[in-house]
């Protein structure tokens, strides 16, 4: 028999909620349906494999996890498999570090939020100023949300905010072993 940590965490072998693919409305629907079918008490296990997607959907799923934890007093474990990129890492940030696991060979991708926007300046000057201010407000709010998520992700880990803030613009890929050594996850199975 090979040396393995799996025997320490037998619950991870039979997850209650299995998510894969793009983080989008369809994943959120699947997530809600699977949660509704879960046992009403005891620890839950949620797995995800994703190349990313909509960060706001990831935040909504994470908020559901937080509400279950706070209102029902339940422990919920996170298991990232193969790829936990972008919005997947946003979802992972909803789980305390001591409830996060990755499978061998899994990679995390942490990066800044992206925006593509064309601003058409046309009309009375005050309307132009208002349009520019609205776009700036959108960007500033998105940066604030991103920073909140980054702080949640690294809370309880060895990663200083400044390091994540410095590496995120150029896509920070983190191997499972590095994630464990940085304290971003409890263990690798």
Q: Model-flagged regions — what are they?
A:
Residues 1-189:
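Terminal-region recognition feature
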